[in-house]
Amino acid sequence: MEGFWNSKSIIRITLSFIFLFICHFLDVLAAPTRNLCRPEQRDALLAFKNEFEIGKPSPDHCKIYGIESPRKTDSWGNNSDCCNWEGVTCNAKSGEVIELDLSCSSLHGRFHSNSSIRNLHFLTTLDLSFNDFKGQITSSIENLSHLTYLDLSSNHFSGQILNSIGNLSRLTYLNLFDNQFSGQAPSSICNLSHLTFLDLSYNRFFGQFPSSIGGLSHLTTLSLFSNKFSGQIPSSIGNLSNLTTLDLSNNNFSGQIPSFIGNLSQLTFLGLFSNNFVGEIPSSFGNLNQLTRLYVDDNKLSGNFPNVLLNLTGLSLLSLSNNKFTGTLPPNITSLSNLMDFDASDNAFTGTFPSFLFTIPSLTYIRLNGNQLKGTLEFGNISSPSNLYELDIGNNNFIGPIPSSISKLVKLFRLDISHLNTQGPVDFSIFSHLKSLLDLNISHLNTTTRIDLNYFLSYFKRLLLLDLSGNHVSATNKSSVSDPPSQLIQSLYLSGCGITEFPEFVRTQHELGFLDISNNKIKGQVPDWLWRLPILYYVNLSNNTLIGFQRPSKPEPSLLYLLGSNNNFIGKIPSFICGLRSLNTLDLSDNNFNGSIPRCMGHLKSTLSVLNLRQNHLSGGLPKQIFEILRSLDVGHNQLVGKLPRSLSFFSTLEVLNVESNRINDTFPFWLSSLPKLQVLVLRSNAFHGPIHEATFPELRIIDISHNRFNGTLPTEYFVKWSAMSSLGKNEDQSNEKYMGSGLYYQDSMVLMNKGVAMELVRILTIYTAVDFSGNRFEGEIPKSIGLLKELLVLSLSNNAFSGHMPSSMGNLTALESLDVSKNKLTGEIPQELGDLSFLAYMNFSHNQLAGLVPGGQQFLTQNCSAFEDNLGLFGSSLEEVCRDIHTPASHQQFETPETEEEDEDLISWIAAAIGFGPGIAFGLMFGYILVSYKPEWFMNPFDRNNRRQKRHKTTH
């Protein structure tokens, strides 16, 4: 009975609890909903949202990175729980906002130091990536001391990162990728001892990276890609034993690749490309057993193929391109059984084609173009079908036929066998099996076979890029194929193909963006339909015999580059060009255009970056208000008059200004010194006049103001502020060839006097420096400040009236290759310091009043004797050496000392007197005999007249 009662009691109690729970639950449901979000947190979030503009969503941009919900702040409102807002995470107990993810939310605006985000004190995660924030990282963020995760990537933050970022001592993740931060990376970053991820890539940091980076022992990812860090890699990086990703690519790091990188045995990714590394790859790299991707391309590495890399059997990608590697590729590279992508292009590898590469089953990309491989192109046994997607072996020294086994590479989407010396006919049907090709380069095959373009294109259904340059292409508007090609080409290269008419099939290529038909024999007019291709952005018509343009009804606005130089275009510049509203580069140089520069080109003022109209017959003045973002303006060799428009001083992007060989009549444009990027200034052969006042040209590398009427003296400190010519070598690696221009599609060119001859610079190296003041009326002394231009290569001051001594500071011009001070009034000695200038290959001191010992440097011994002529006081062994084959008396007199010269002059005077004395006596005796004997009337009458005057005078007195 007792047990029963106990069981009954338990049941009753249990039912009572259930009843009470249900009642409580119903009360809860009936009660108003409690907000987890704290009011001050909600207010801070709303205030932060209102600090910025919210733009249109950009889902495509964000989807690339897996972000599917842009404009997260659209869900934010005053009457809802902020903890339920998209992108907001709260602490479940306290209601404090601890995570804020506003990535890809279309937020625009500048961060302020008093931003409301500072009130979210307990934030541990802040993700503001993929927006349009501007300004500096302010204390509003740097004081969020609880942060462990901070992502500001892909914005427009700028300025320096303050040392106070070191206050975020709990950070484990810091991503500043793709902003505009500048200055030196603060050493305080290295105080963030818990960091596992640090990405500073795609910014503008410079200088040496802090050596204290080695203290971040937990770091697994370090990316400094695409900045301007310089110097050697900090040795402390060798202490980061947990690193799996190290990317130092696209900086200015120099020296040898340090061996301590081989200590980072956990690395799976190593990027060192696009720096200034020299020497060989360290043997310690053999320790990187976990490495799967290695980039060392675009450096100055040398030596044979680094066999130490053959130990890295896990490599899937190996990029060695654009270095100075030599020797042959080793057959045991096949030990890299996981290799998928192998790039050894643009080196100096020799030997025959390494067909053993085809035995690596995983290999899908082979790039060996731009080496010195030679012999017959043989592929050996190719598995069928091959897995190869890309084969680039062009621009080598291969000879012979195209291997028939190429037809087995059926998965190829890119093939480059350009510059293969086939030495005979080619059966182009061999390519008909490569149905997957998207990109085909068979330019310059040295074949006698003519290509029927329409027939050739019928082989392909997917082809997007075709390069047939340098081959013989048949009449493109006549074909044995009845139907036009069905595929839509995007890029077509037909340069130097002997074409005489516009390829008609282009008319139907509505996907065509790039067209190069330069260096042909195309005559007549450019068809109007060309400008109606909807996405055409590049057209190169240069070096043909075209005479004009058919006027299009309405050109498409897509064109960016129009290159039409060296044709026979006549008449005025066609006005339809003004309708190409996206035009960036216009080159119509070396034609026969006349008239003035069209004022309607003002429609292009916000897009036109390059305008080249040199070598035409243009007249009138330069338009005043048509260009805003010009980078390069070349109107040389025309008939332009008037003055330089002062509006040029507002073109802050201008780098090149060339107005040579016109009729411009103006004073020196000192006001151009306000242009922060001006690098080339050419005023040669105009009617400029007057003094040239002191001006600051911080970026100027080439100045040619020769053959004008400038006069006056040059101020002593004239060259003091020409910093690019004095410090260029400190900021740039001179062996790294970079050219002025717009990259792949256009590069600036000019003609400059160098070493006494006109030299055409088809491309202008950014490290090339020259000063040409010749052919003016300058006087006074050459400024001593000329010696500050330590990177100067060419200096010409000839044909002026400079006087006084040549400054000894010229000996500081250690890079000088050409010096011309001829035809002035210089006195004194040639500075002995010039004898130490080892690069000085050409010099001209002629037609001055120089005297004294000629310097004895080796470069002086290689000069022509004419370089010293008409300087009667020069002497020395160097002069005797270079003039020893000259035997004229004037030449010998030139070498003698002043004392010897004086003695010789006296002797010559006596000899001349003696020579004249003998004939004089003989002539006098003969003349006297005639007078006495014959008394000629013409001689005696004057004496009679005198006698009569005397008699008359006496009679009157």
From Swiss-Prot:
Keywords: Cell membrane, Glycoprotein, Leucine-rich repeat, Membrane, Receptor, Repeat, Signal, Transmembrane, Transmembrane helix
Family annotation (Pfam families): LRR_1, LRR_14, LRR_8, LRRNT_2
SUPFAM superfamilies to which the protein is assigned, alphabetical: L domain-like, RNI-like
Membrane topology: Single-pass type I membrane protein
UniProt KW RNA-binding keyword: no
Glycosylation sites: 78, 114, 143, 167, 191, 239, 242, 252, 263, 311, 332, 381, 441, 446, 477, 540, 543, 594, 665, 711, 812, 844, 864
Ranges per topology, Extracellular: 31-910
Signal sequence coordinates: 1-30
Family: Belongs to the RLP family.
Protein name (Swiss-Prot/TrEMBL): Receptor-like protein 53
Origin species: Arabidopsis thaliana (Mouse-ear cress)
Gene: RLP53
